[in-house]
Curated annotation (Swiss-Prot):
The lineage of its organism: Bacteria, Bacillati, Bacillota, Clostridia, Peptostreptococcales. Keywords: ATP-binding, Carbohydrate metabolism, Kinase, Magnesium, Metal-binding, Multifunctional enzyme, Nucleotide-binding, Serine/threonine-protein kinase, Transferase. This is HPr kinase/phosphorylase. It comes from the Bacteria. The keyword Magnesium applies. Both phosphorylation and phosphorolysis are carried out by the same active site and suggest a common mechanism for both reactions. CDD domains: HprK_C. It is an enzyme of class 2 (transferase). Gene3D superfamilies: HprK N-terminal domain-like, P-loop containing nucleotide triphosphate hydrolases.
């Protein structure tokens, strides 16, 4: 399971550290957060101590209503659990008992000036991105008519050359050769280029090209969701290719199924144009219209009418 240090979280989200506990060894391994209202009330059954703890205005005000002895006992018990860190929102003052118990058990206390809702949203989004399962695949990733298209195929089949033609047609390059893919939450696969080759594309016979310099910033995109996979393969006369489009094929990446279309490569076929059409067709399907199914329905209706004559 992936994890990050509390120190990295603190630096990346510009949080204020309120005690000097070493944060490099404190690890965060879940994207979920916990507001410990029940624990401050003395109920510790099912305490999600492995999560980041968030103290907002409600929890802070509740602590103020407790007498010193009770407040210290509740905080002492909460901090005795192995929590990764505790974050106080809205720039609220830190109760002295909280700092004392945090130092006693070596727990990191951070503070943010954002309101609690925005803080929780920001931390969850950050953790989902940082802790997301990741894989690197060989291919080209582009944004075509707003559809994230991952073009795959064996080396030398023409993926990069096709990408250049698509860029000339106004589409956006995300990554060439190596595509870093993250699973964000349960429904999204997001792809980007490794930092070292970002905006670059390799064309055999020419070399490395800087797409941003050659075509402008309007030809690139940092990252995109992956909606469709186009697999390029050499034409095989012994193989039967789908000519109607009724069969939906998928490829599984990081546990998610992504729609896949196989395009056979043959001289005189305009692959860039075919990929554009595939992207448009995919978008049309997602909007509820399936051309192949419509054709099949018409055909079946025609056959039924003829059989009744």
């Amino acid at each position: 399971m992936k994890s990050i240090t509390v120190e990295k979280l603190m630096k990346d989200l510009n949080m204020e550290e309120l005690n000097s506990i070493e944060a490099t060894a404190l690890l965060i391994s879940t994207t979920d957060l916990n507001r410990p209202g029940m624990q401050l009330a003395g109920f510790f059954d099912y305490f999600a101590y492995e999560r980041i703890q968030i103290i907002g205005k409600v929890e802070h005000r509740y602590l103020e209503t407790l007498d010193t002895k009770t407040r210290k006992e509740r905080l002492d018990r909460m901090m005795s659990y192995d929590i990764p860190c505790l974050i106080i929102s809205r720039g609220l003052e830190v109760p002295e008992e909280l700092l004392c118990t945090a130092n006693k058990y070596q727990r990191k206390i951070l503070r943010s000036h954002k309101n609690t809702t925005k803080l929780i949203s920001k931390v969850i989004n950050y953790l989902e991105d940082t802790l997301a399962p990741t894989i690197t695949l060989h291919g080209v990733l582009m944004d075509i008519y707003g559809v994230g298209v991952l073009i795959t195929g064996k080396s030398g089949i023409g993926k990069s050359e096709t990408a250049v033609e698509l860029i000339k047609r106004g589409h956006l390059l995300v990554a060439d050769d190596a595509v870093e893919i993250k699973r964000i939450g349960h429904e999204v696969l997001q792809g980007c280029a490794p930092e070292i080759i970002r905006h670059m594309i390799e064309v055999r016979g020419i070399g490395i090209l800087d797409v941003k310099s050659l075509f402008g910033v309007g030809a690139i995109k940092i990252k995109t969701d992956i909606d469709l996979i186009i697999d390029l393969e050499e034409w095989d006369s012994t193989k039967s290719y789908d000519r109607l489009g009724l069969d939906d094929n998928h490829r599984e990446i990081l546990g998610m199924k992504i729609d896949e279309v196989t395009i056979p490569i043959k001289p005189a076929r305009n692959i860039a144009l075919i990929i554009e059409v595939a992207a448009r067709n995919h978008r049309q399907k997602k909007m509820g219209y399936h051309a192949a199914q419509e054709f099949n329905d018409r055909l079946m209706k025609s056959l039924e009418e003829k059989s009744q004559q």
